[in-house]
């Protein structure tokens, strides 16, 4: 069982690297209702709240990611699942054509799962920082101490989180900055969903209320129930152990 609270200033900036799509926010505001969602991505002329978690490498080794992946390129998705050991994946996912294809792609390109996640996170991070600098200015960004939150499946074991941490470090997210060290935090995906839902305008959760959160993604499904212990700030704990 686990418990968590929603702080008065939400964690920032959060990144949900999922199997098929990814969303990212620049959260410099104290008001949780005033969150800046990154919607501009390389390779597309329209605004999108999420981008496909897809990666390819050019003949020269250049990284193409998300909407920037050429339509005729050999690409990989679902690569985050490969951070898990085979004994910790179920049979259905093991025979998934996407997962088999991902393993073959990494073998062919001489990449590890950590390398693939790192390359994608690195491209995402550069794009995000560039957008924030454009909106806020370089001096403002240079003065900020970053706190980065990456959401992961609730049932992930410690070694998988360590692999994700290594990928984030390898991506340059944790590199030394004059403003101070960057803090990297992992949040369970259902917890992030619950936090997002409960801070929506007009919602008034009461003490003792129970919420069931179903996170049905492209590669995993988590279902967890939370009971509200207090409302100011909102503190919750698992009502029953989560399954996924």
Predicted regions and their residues:
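Conserved nucleotide-binding/hydrolysis micro-motifs of P-loop NTPases
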Residues: 155-157, 191-192, 218-221, 230, ...
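Phosphate-binding loop and its immediate beta->loop->alpha context
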Residues: 31-169
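Residues that form ligand- and interface-recognition hot spots within folded domains
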Residues: 16-19, 24, 59, 83, ...
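Hydrophobic, small-residue-rich alpha-helical packing segments that form membrane-like cores
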Residues: 164-212, 216-217, 235-236
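Gly/Thr-rich phosphate-binding beta-strand-loop-beta motif of the actin/hexokinase/Hsp70
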Residues: 1-35, 198-238
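Beta-strand elements of modular eukaryotic interaction domains
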Residues: 3, 28-29, 41-46, 54-55, ...
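Glycine-rich phosphate-binding loop plus the immediately following alpha-helix
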Residues: 50-59, 74, 228-244
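Extended hydrophobic secondary-structure segments that form protein cores and membrane-embedded regions
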Residues: 11-13, 145-153, 183-188, 211-215, ...
């Amino acid at each position: 069982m686990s418990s968590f609270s929603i702080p008065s200033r939400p964690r920032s900036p959060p990144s949900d690297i999922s199997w098929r799509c990814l969303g990212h926010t620049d959260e410099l505001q104290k008001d949780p209702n005033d969150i800046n969602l990154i919607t501009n991505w390389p390779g597309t002329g329209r605004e999108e709240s999420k981008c496909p978690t897809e990666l390819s490498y050019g003949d020269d080794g250049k990284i193409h990611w998300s909407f920037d992946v050429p339509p005729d390129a050999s690409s990989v998705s679902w690569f985050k699942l490969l951070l898990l050991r085979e004994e910790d994946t179920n049979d259905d996912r093991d025979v998934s054509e996407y997962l088999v294809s991902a393993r073959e792609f990494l073998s062919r390109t001489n990449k590890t799962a950590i390398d693939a996640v790192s390359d994608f996170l690195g491209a995402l991070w550069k794009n995000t920082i560039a957008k924030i600098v454009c909106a806020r200015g370089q001096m403002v960004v240079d003065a900020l101490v970053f706190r980065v939150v990456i959401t992961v499946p609730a049932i992930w074991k410690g070694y998988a989180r360590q692999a994700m941490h290594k990928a984030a470090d390898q991506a340059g997210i944790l590199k030394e900055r004059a403003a101070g060290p960057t803090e990297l935090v992992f949040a369970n995906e259902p917890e992030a969903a619950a936090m997002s839902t409960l801070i929506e305008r007009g919602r008034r959760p009461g003490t003792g209320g129970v919420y069931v959160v179903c996170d049905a993604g492209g590669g995993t499904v988590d279902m967890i129930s939370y009971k509200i212990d207090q409302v100011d700030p909102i503190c919750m704990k698992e009502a029953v152990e989560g399954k996924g």
